[in-house]
């Protein structure tokens, strides 16, 4: 399971000209699910994201987490994060979780995130989404739970 997290000034997801999720300051998280990923590992990753200190504190250091920064969380499923790219000129998506199974796990992870944090927005699983964001920094990290 991989998460690409970006600190943003604002972000939104649009599907069929409708905004499905929108935040102001916060974290935009692209979430990739692998074949063997489980709910418990996903919960650990969500917990880490929520506690990860990537916002400037009163001293200008990355000392605040999402809650302390009073930010929002925008979760977007992105199976392409699981691609194998070491060989050849075309990504191999074999390591990604099959879509039906991934939707169940993604929905469970969204539900878990909502139970742990007040301001969670999402895209739509497997939809053709347009993601608009204003990066803050830019500050981008890839987190992985095996």
From Swiss-Prot:
Molecular functions (GO terms): D-tyrosyl-tRNA(Tyr) deacylase activity; Gly-tRNA(Ala) deacylase activity; Ser(Gly)-tRNA(Ala) hydrolase activity; tRNA binding
Transmembrane segments: none
Keyword terms of this UniProt record: Cytoplasm, Hydrolase, RNA-binding, tRNA-binding
InterPro entries: Daa-tRNA_deacyls_DTD (IPR003732), DTD-like_sf (IPR023509)
Matching SUPFAM superfamilies: DTD-like
Enzyme class: hydrolase
Residue numbers covered by motif Gly-cisPro motif, important for rejection of L-amino acids: 137-138
Biological process, per Gene Ontology: D-amino acid catabolic process
A cellular component annotation (GO) from this entry: cytoplasm
Compartments (UniProt record): Cytoplasm
Enzyme Commission (EC) number: 3.1.1.96
Catalytic activity line of the entry: glycyl-tRNA(Ala) + H2O = tRNA(Ala) + glycine + H(+); a D-aminoacyl-tRNA + H2O = a tRNA + a D-alpha-amino acid + H(+)
Matching NCBIfam families: D-aminoacyl-tRNA deacylase
Role description: An aminoacyl-tRNA editing enzyme that deacylates mischarged D-aminoacyl-tRNAs. Also deacylates mischarged glycyl-tRNA(Ala), protecting cells against glycine mischarging by AlaRS. Acts via tRNA-based rather than protein-based catalysis; rejects L-amino acids rather than detecting D-amino acids in the active site. By recycling D-aminoacyl-tRNA to D-amino acids and free tRNA molecules, this enzyme counteracts the toxicity associated with the formation of D-aminoacyl-tRNA entities in vivo and helps enforce protein L-homochirality.
PANTHER family xrefs: D-AMINOACYL-TRNA DEACYLASE 1 (PTHR10472:SF5), D-TYROSYL-TRNA TYR DEACYLASE (PTHR10472)
Annotated family: Belongs to the DTD family.
HAMAP family, A to Z: Deacylase_Dtd
Quaternary structure (record): Homodimer.
Name of the protein this chain belongs to: D-aminoacyl-tRNA deacylase
Protein encoded by which gene: dtd
